[in-house]
């Protein structure tokens, strides 16, 4: 589905461009799509978008780093369908206490909170942003102690990003 082919101008995956599939370009199918287009000798152009992490920070009017608090941002996902490499499990990453953006995890929020609590503490701020940068975006702010109840009240099930950290 590429410009120059009959009746097709753009290819979108899940309502997003391939590089921002499900608002998580690092987990999108763009690599597979590029290989297929090249194999078929079909010209294409990739137009980059704004990452979900940047969109969420902007929407929340918040920075992701702050001197003396956190100077590192970790972008990850919660591994349930694909195994995470050794050392990249959430509890390993949480040891850094950096600002963390967790993709594809809202359905596993109880497990995520359990892995974060020992490292960040119950009072650590957390935001769950549903459909960031879409007209119907919504979000919940809380702490690791109360976020599960707040998210359950909103019934977020998919297309949500979790931002955690003291910034």
Where are these regions (language model features)?
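Glycine-rich beta-strand-to-loop/alpha-helix junction loops that act as flexible
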Residues: 1-6, 19-23, 48
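A contiguous loop/helix-start segment that scaffolds small-molecule binding in enzyme catalytic cores
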Residues: 6, 11-20, 29, 34-36, ...
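Hydrophobic beta-strand scaffold residues
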Residues: 44-46, 64
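Active-site nucleophile and cofactor-binding loops and adjacent substrate-binding regions
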Residues: 46-52
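Short, glycine-/small-residue-rich phosphate/pyrophosphate-handling segment
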Residues: 52, 57-81
């Amino acid at each position: 589905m590429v410009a120059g082919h009959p009746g097709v101008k753009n290819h979108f995956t899940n309502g997003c461009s391939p590089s921002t599939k499900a608002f998580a370009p690092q987990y999108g199918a763009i690599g597979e799509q590029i290989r297929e287009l090249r194999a078929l000798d079909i010209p294409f152009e990739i137009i980059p978008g704004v990452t979900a992490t940047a969109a969420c920070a902007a929407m929340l009017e918040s920075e992701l780093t702050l001197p003396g608090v956190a100077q590192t941002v970790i972008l990850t996902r919660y591994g349930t369908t694909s195994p995470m490499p050794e050392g990249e499990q959430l509890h390993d990453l949480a040891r850094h206490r950096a600002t963390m953006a967790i993709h594809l995890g809202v359905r596993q929020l109880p497990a995520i909170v359990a892995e974060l609590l020992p490292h960040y503490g119950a009072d650590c701020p957390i935001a769950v942003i549903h459909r960031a940068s879409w007209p119907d975006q919504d979000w919940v702010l809380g702490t690791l102690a109360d976020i599960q109840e707040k998210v359950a009240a909103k019934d977020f099930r998919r297309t949500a990003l979790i931002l955690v950290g003291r910034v």
